[in-house]
Structure formats: structure tokens, C-alpha cells
């Protein structure tokens, strides 16, 4: 039963109910207490201020979206954790972000193409409420009364942006959107957008269409749940974060590249697409370090042929 908002908003949130009436089991939120030595480095002077003087890089392409056959998946990386996922009949945006700033953090690499080059979007998925994943300015521009799927507790942040129905999911819950099956998967992270809203959910998405499954991890530190996710789904393409593993707070809230390789092997996926690197300087590590470390780790584990390094704005048919 949709949960009505005020008449002013004229939007509904649909919360999926577990079949047995019990609340789905949630993974443990990461500890928010920083490491004891976190204060020994100064993120403001060593990262934020120097970034202000760095020119944005990256080419913006006039995207040439190919004609997609039934059973094919076309994936376009926009940058950071943002992807356009296309099949022969639908277009899906995941964690779209075209903004030049995350509050005081400068975007250092441009999106792969301008937002007005997007095809008509049928569905939008947002993994959690952090500013780099839930960008209200971008969502407001792409909203055209299509459904949006978010974790439980995030619906009130997006319901007034122009989406017809907001689907809130808890872990392992699923919603059917036309030919698309979307499930929220566990992760090891946290979901607060501000300091006092720790109730907000967070997770990844397993998206199944035409018999193929794409897994977008969202944000996560490494945790045993990746093996469980691999048990639940036969994953063809895994979009895994590899950056921001040296955050200014010292909290271990993101995987490093070596852990991402381990997560990929436990997921037992076929293709590894790295993301969440090279766009915003969210950690102390150099902007180009995550990809270098990933490629080295992939070689050492013999999976380099399974790693697909994408260029922002260039569609790839899989």
C-alpha cells in the first residue's frame, strides 16, 4: 500500500513488505569511530585546498549510443559511481551525478557527456543518501515522473524531485519494474546524509533483465556478505568501487583495490568494472593510484582479462 505524502508533494513511497512479515536481516553498519591516528593528517591543507587549483580533466563526448539487440547490455560510465544501463527496450540511471562540486569537494574529472545528451530514462536507482551518490540537483534534472528505487529511509529525500513513485527496499527485497527485476543487496557502509539521520538505509543493487544480472555495489568496505550475494545471484557484470580507501576520518568505509579483487572473486562474477575513483578526491590517496593498484592486483590474481576499465562517456555493449 503506497504511503501518501502531503497533497503539496503528490508523491507516494512504496515500501516492500517481507512475505513472512518479518523484518529482513540487515548487515552491520560500519563503526563510525575513526582510527586513533586520524587527526595526524590534515585533509583541508593536503587535499581540499590543493584541489582548488587543479584544472578539471576529461573529454566530454557526443555519445553514440548503439542499437542494442535483445539479450545485450549497453553500459556507459558517466564518472564516479554513475552509470547509464541500457537494454533493447529500457534505459536505467544508477547513482547519477553531473555536479561540479560535492559541497566543498571539487569534481576533478568531467562527466563523460553532458546531461542533455541522455536518452529518455525509464528508471532511476540510488544506492544511498551520501552526496556523491544522491545528487538532488542531478535527480531533479533527470526526473520525468518515472519510478525511482532507493533503500529504506531514503524516500523522503527524493520524493519531491519529480518522480512518480518511490520504491523503498530493505535487504534482499525485490521490485519488478516492467522487464527489470531490482533487488537491494547488503553492504558494509553507512547511510546518513547528515549527522542525525543514521536511520537511512544503504546497499547495492542486483539488476536482472533479459536473463542477465548486473551488480552495482554502491559503497562498501570489504565484508563476508559478498560471498552471500554471489550465492543469491548469477552475476554477469560487477560494478565495484576501488577508491576513497584513505578517507579523512580514518574510518574503513570503502574497499581498497586489492579488497575489491577479493570481493569480485567471492561474487563469482564474469566481468569486473571498476568505479568510484578518478572523479572526486574523497581520500588521501592520489587520484590515479586506485586504478594502478587494481591492475597490479588483477595481474597477481590472474583475472586481468576480466577487468573492464571504462572511459567516461563511451558506451560498451556486453
Residue ranges and their predicted role:
Residues 21, 54, 58-70, 78, ...:
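Pre-active-site segment of Zn-dependent metallo-hydrolases
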Amino acid at each position: 500500500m503506497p504511503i501518501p505524502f502531503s497533497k503539496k508533494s503528490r508523491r507516494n513511497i512504496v515500501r516492500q513488505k517481507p512475505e513472512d512479515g518479518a523484518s529482513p536481516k540487515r548487515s552491520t553498519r560500519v563503526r563510525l569511530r575513526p582510527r586513533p591516528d586520524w587527526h595526524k593528517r590534515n585533509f583541508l591543507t593536503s587535499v581540499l585546498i590543493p584541489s582548488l587549483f587543479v584544472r578539471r580533466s576529461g573529454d566530454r563526448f557526443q555519445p553514440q549510443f548503439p542499437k542494442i539487440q535483445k539479450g545485450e547490455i549497453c553500459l556507459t560510465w558517466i564518472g564516479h559511481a554513475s552509470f547509464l544501463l541500457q537494454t533493447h527496450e529500457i534505459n536505467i540511471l544508477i547513482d547519477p551525478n553531473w555536479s561540479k562540486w560535492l559541497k566543498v569537494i571539487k569534481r576533478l574529472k568531467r562527466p563523460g557527456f553532458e546531461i542533455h545528451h541522455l536518452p529518455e530514462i525509464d528508471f532511476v536507482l540510488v544506492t544511498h543518501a551520501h552526496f556523491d551518490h544522491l545528487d538532488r540537483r542531478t535527480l531533479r534534472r533527470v526526473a520525468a515522473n518515472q519510478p525511482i528505487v532507493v533503500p529504506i529511509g531514503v524516500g523522503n529525500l527524493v520524493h519531491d524531485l519529480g518522480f512518480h513513485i518511490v520504491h523503498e527496499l530493505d535487504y534482499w527485497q525485490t521490485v519488478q519494474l516492467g522487464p527489470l527485476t531490482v533487488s537491494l543487496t547488503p553492504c558494509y557502509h553507512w547511510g546518513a546524509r547528515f549527522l542525525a539521520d543514521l536511520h537511512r538505509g544503504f546497499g547495492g543493487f542486483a539488476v536482472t533483465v533479459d536473463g542477465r544480472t548486473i551488480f552495482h555495489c554502491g559503497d562498501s568496505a570489504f565484508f563476508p556478505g559478498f560471498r552471500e550475494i554471489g550465492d543469491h545471484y548469477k552475476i554477469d557484470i560487477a560494478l565495484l568501487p576501488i577508491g576513497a580507501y584513505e578517507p579523512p576520518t580514518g574510518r574503513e568505509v570503502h574497499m581498497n583495490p586489492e579488497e575489491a579483487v577479493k570481493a569480485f572473486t567471492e561474487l563469482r562474477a564474469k566481468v569486473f568494472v571498476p568505479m568510484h575513483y578518478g572523479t572526486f578526491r574523497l581520500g588521501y590517496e592520489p587520484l590515479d593510484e586506485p586504478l594502478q593498484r587494481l591492475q597490479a592486483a588483477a595481474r597477481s590474481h590472474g583475472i586481468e582479462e576480466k577487468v573492464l576499465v571504462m572511459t567516461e562517456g563511451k558506451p560498451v555493449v556486453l
